[in-house]
Amino acid sequence: MLLGACDTFRAAANEQIKHWAERLNVDIVSSQHGADSAAVAFDALEAAKSRGRDIVILDTAGRLHTKRNLMKELEKLHRVIKKQDDSAPHHSWLVVDGSLGSNSIEQARVFHKSFPL
């Protein structure tokens, strides 16, 4: 398994996921704060191939479905993944805040358009 730290927006995101990767003894690919998350995903997929890893988990930044620029970033991430493996992604998870109530359904619909769930 290999982790791709694609949350390049939140200040402590890299440190947090690196901590868990170390605790779990899992390889990780990360970049600098503010880097292109799709580039990190590409690097993670390439690293997984070269290291013989068959599972890659890409952790992306949280985002609101109403922020079009962030949804476009997610679409770019999806295109990069598909170029690496036409059948990917094999699984996609959307984690939502439980307090959103019925708004989470609309959020899932919008996310599904940008990155199939």
Predicted regions located by residue number:
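P-loop/Walker A NTP-binding module and the surrounding RecA-like catalytic core of P-loop NTPases
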Residues: 1-117
